[in-house]
């Protein structure tokens, strides 16, 4: 699984809209959409925050072994 797909899955499993997810990380809804569609990627500090907030290891996020 790609990073964008993992972010989308995490967000959807928690019942969050792109807008709500964006507010958690001080970015726009369009930025979240771009992450999920792999047009851009979160910076490392944001990835760490996502990892901590949703209890998903960075290794899982980056290597694409999210289940």
Where are these regions (language model features)?
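Short coil turns linking two alpha-helices in DNA-binding domains
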Residues: 17, 28-31, 43, 57
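Conserved hydrophobic/aromatic packing and binding residues within compact polymer-binding modules
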Residues: 7, 21-22, 32-35, 61
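Short, Lys/Arg-enriched C-terminal cap helix and immediately downstream tail that follows
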Residues: 8, 44-45
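Short, charged recognition helix plus adjacent turn
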Residues: 64-67
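Central "turn" residue of the DNA-binding helix-turn-helix
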Residues: 15, 25-26, 38, 55
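DNA major-groove recognition helix of helix-turn-helix/homeodomain DNA-binding modules
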Residues: 45-60
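A detector for short, charged/polar N-terminal pre-domain segments
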Residues: 1-2
């Amino acid at each position: 699984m790609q990073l964008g797909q993992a972010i989308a899955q995490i967000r959807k499993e928690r019942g969050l809209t792109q807008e709500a997810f964006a507010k958690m990380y001080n970015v726009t809804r369009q930025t979240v959409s771009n992450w999920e569609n792999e047009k851009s990627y979160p910076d490392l500090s944001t990835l760490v925050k996502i990892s901590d907030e949703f209890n998903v290891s960075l290794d899982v996020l980056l290597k694409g072994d999210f289940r």
